[in-house]
Regions:
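Absolute protein N-terminus
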Residues: 1, 21-22
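Bacterial N-terminal signal peptides that target proteins for export
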Residues: 1-7
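Short helix-onset patch at the extreme N-terminus, typifying the N->h transition
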Residues: 7-8, 27
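N-terminal signal peptide c-region/cleavage motif recognized by signal peptidases
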Residues: 16-17
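Subset of outer-membrane beta-barrel
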Residues: 22-332
Length: 332
């Protein structure tokens, strides 16, 4: 059983006090997981790509987030069209979400250059959200907020845009446009309620060759805003609920087209964030198409007093990688 005070401490990081206002899970190695937040990325690698990730947030903290993601995407015979598939499983405290999504992207050339492309993507998804509140030990067992478990099926759709060339990219997306009230309609209006938020993503980066393609410098950023254009407010204070807008600023080096090594800094642009961290990561791309990666996040917020740091592992496979490495190296 999860103790009530500890649970509120953990959930308050991802959710807001007075409500369970959920935001999307995060990945430090988001460069290899872009389909999870932008459907326009589907097919942009020019070949079938698979990626599996596992993230353990705040080691040693009971109820801390644990996330797994499986992504696959590929262009079709019509090179303008890409399709993708993603499966996400996220567990935090007494709640959990399993999300299945399919993506469709259409790409077009921009201007006279054949190297600059704009991809527009759509996504349809179905998620199962579970709130196992009976796991929580509370002082008053008759509290209606914790008297029953909840399971909801949540259909959704999303959209995104992805502008990219050989040496830079820029993306804007909202993978889940609809916001769902996760309470049952017959619940007491003053009881603890839950709602998932619309998340907006802005991403960008560049590849700067230092020694031809033998050493490439890649700066990048990912901005995430939860609750954008939302009117959800705390019922007691009347204040708007939502996680602060966060940004991940990173820099990486690609060595001999095989080894990635990088670092990033994650923080909030407004308000306080428990996600503040300094992150280190590496990835190895084998010539047979396999890719392995790992990331370690050093917690910088006050939560470091109650938990250890976070880690992430990744396994990927890219088909026909030998041909693509020779003709058109990919940096994003």
């Amino acid at each position: 059983m999860i103790k009530f005070r500890l649970l509120l401490f953990v959930c308050g990081i991802y959710w807001s006090v007075g409500a369970l206002a959920q935001q999307d899970p995060m990945f430090t190695n988001y460069h290899f997981n872009s389909l999870a937040f932008n459907p326009a990325y589907a097919g942009s690698n020019e070949h079938l790509t698979l990626n599996l990730s596992h993230r353990q947030q705040w080691l040693g903290l009971d109820g801390a987030p644990v996330t797994q993601a499986l992504n696959a995407h590929s262009p079709l015979r019509n090179e303008r069209v890409g399709i993708g598939f993603s499966l996400l499983n996220d567990k935090i405290g007494p709640g959990g979400t399993t999300d299945l999504a399919g993506s469709y992207a259409y790409r077009m050339q921009v201007g006279a250059s054949k190297k600059l492309k704009l991809s527009l993507g759509l996504q349809a998804s179905m998620a199962n959200w579970r709130g196992n509140f009976s796991e929580i030990t509370v002082e008053h067992s008759d509290d209606p907020s914790f008297s029953q478990n909840i399971s909801r099926w949540l259909p959704n759709f999303g959209a995104g845009a992805y502008l990219y060339g050989e040496k830079y990219y820029l993306g804007l997306s909202c993978p889940r446009l609809l916001e769902h009230d996760l309470r049952k309609t017959n619940q007491d209006t003053e009881a603890l309620f839950a709602k998932n938020y619309r998340n907006i993503y802005l991403s960008g980066g560049a590849a700067i060759p230092l020694r031809d393609d033998q050493l490439v410098f890649r700066p990048s950023f990912l901005l995430q805003s939860a609750g954008f254009l939302s009117n959800l407010k705390d019922r007691s204070s009347g204040q708007k609920i939502g996680a602060p807008t966060s940004v991940n600023l990173g820099a990486a080096f690609l060595i001999r087209q095989l080894i990635w090594t990088g670092a990033s800094y994650r923080t909030a642009l407004s308000g306080k964030s428990s996600h503040d961290s300094a992150n280190l990561w590496m990835a190895w791309s084998l010539r047979n198409g396999m890719r392995f990666g790992a990331a370690y996040d050093i917690t910088l917020s006050k939560i470091r007093k109650a938990s250890s740091n976070s880690f992430e592992i990744m396994l990927g496979y890219e088909f026909d990688i030998k041909v693509k490495q020779v003709t058109s190296p990919r940096y994003f």
